[in-house]
Design a protein with these regions (language model features):
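Helix-loop-helix module between adjacent transmembrane segments
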Residues: 1-15, 23-52, 81-84, 218-228, ...
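Membrane-interface loop-to-helix entry segments
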Residues: 1-4, 8, 54-81, 90-100, ...
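Helix-loop-helix connectors at the membrane interface of multi-pass transporters/channels
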Residues: 13-37, 71-77, 137-147, 151-162, ...
Length: 318
């Protein structure tokens, strides 16, 4: 399940990175086609294989820290050079709208079948998160050693949510501003050429488009790599017999899983489109329902076993 979920993530990132490369170097996307996708997959796989070879501190952590700095520099540039007031105001409106309609949107099943959004996206993302759940839990526990459960939960939910809100608010609102003001036909480009072309088109409307696109390509490449170097690390740890809590899996084992994760996306990208990727995630997530239930029961038993016994007062004892 984890191999399928991670491979799908790489498969989703490859078309976007490939489109950025063709725009940067003036290549013909149609002429290069699948060959360019293979090159991108190889570069991404080689990057996170190198990262996982150096381990948590020297590889994964260092690469992640660099990329966070680059990503926030890119976001700050968009806010500064774009419609700053529009981005900020619409961002606050969007957060308020989500909070007001969270329950309704979370339980919307589209019983009247007015669109295919629920089947195409809501179920797809739920299945993807379910498939990634065991790996994320194992990896977060590994890097959170020494922290309390409260710190770990608040850190994952708080920082993860905040990062998503900031990215959607800045990049999404800037694209919406271009569409509403007739500066760039975002929707038309998405429908005719696909989301990667629309994203590249939006970025090229900024000042110094080549520099912005180069930075965005690097950020996408490293984000893809840092997402899956942790996957290969976790897979190697799970496949190692009797690995002590403070020990690390063998380097060759980590690199083996890294390159194995890079093989499946080749097939998915070759099939083309989002449908094969969505179908793959939905399929691999089904067996993990039972795994999630067992993990939940195991966590409950562990917490009960580790919880300190209640202290009875002298008055209560009498």
């Amino acid at each position: 399940g984890l191999v399928g979920a991670c491979s799908t993530g790489i498969g989703l990132a490859v078309p976007l990175i490939g489109m950025c490369v063709t725009e940067l170097f003036g290549l013909d996307r149609a002429a290069w086609g699948f060959s360019l996708d293979l090159v991108v997959i190889f570069v991404v796989t080689a990057t996170f294989a190198t990262s996982v070879w150096f381990g948590l501190e020297k590889g994964i952590k260092r690469l992640s820290d660099w990329n966070v700095a680059l990503a926030f520099a890119l976001l700050f540039f968009i806010v500064l050079m774009g419609p700053t007031l529009f981005i900020v105001e619409l961002g606050f409106e969007a957060v308020g709208h989500m909070l007001q309609n969270f329950l309704r949107m979370s339980t919307w099943a589209d019983a009247a079948k007015t669109s295919s959004f629920v089947e195409s996206w809501t179920v797809f993302y739920w299945a993807w998160w379910l498939a990634l759940g065991p790996y994320m839990g194992m990896f977060i526990c590994k890097i959170s050693r020494g922290r309390t459960l409260r710190q770990m939960i608040l850190g994952c939910i708080g920082y993860g949510t905040l990062g998503s809100v900031v990215f959607f608010a800045i990049l999404g609102n800037y694209a919406l501003y271009l569409e509403l003001n007739g500066i760039y036909p975002v929707l038309e480009t998405m429908n005719s050429a696909g989301p990667p072309s629309a994203i590249v088109g939006v970025l090229t409307t900024l000042p110094w488009p080549k520099l912005v696109l180069l930075l965005f390509t690097i950020v996408c490449l490293i984000f893809a790599a840092t997402s899956y170097d942790s996957s290969s690390y976790t897979l190697a740890a799970a496949a190692t017999d009797e690995l002590p809590p403070t020990a690390h899996p063998a380097r060759w084992h980590r690199v083996f899983w890294a390159f194995l994760l890079g093989l499946l996306p080749i097939t998915l990208v070759y099939l083309g489109g989002l449908k094969p990727l969505q179908s793959a995630v939905t399929l691999v997530s089904v067996p993990l329902f039972a795994v999630i239930i067992l993990l939940t029961l195991s966590l409950y038993k562990s917490l009960r076993a580790d919880a300190p016994a209640p202290i009875r007062s002298a008055a209560a004892a009498d």
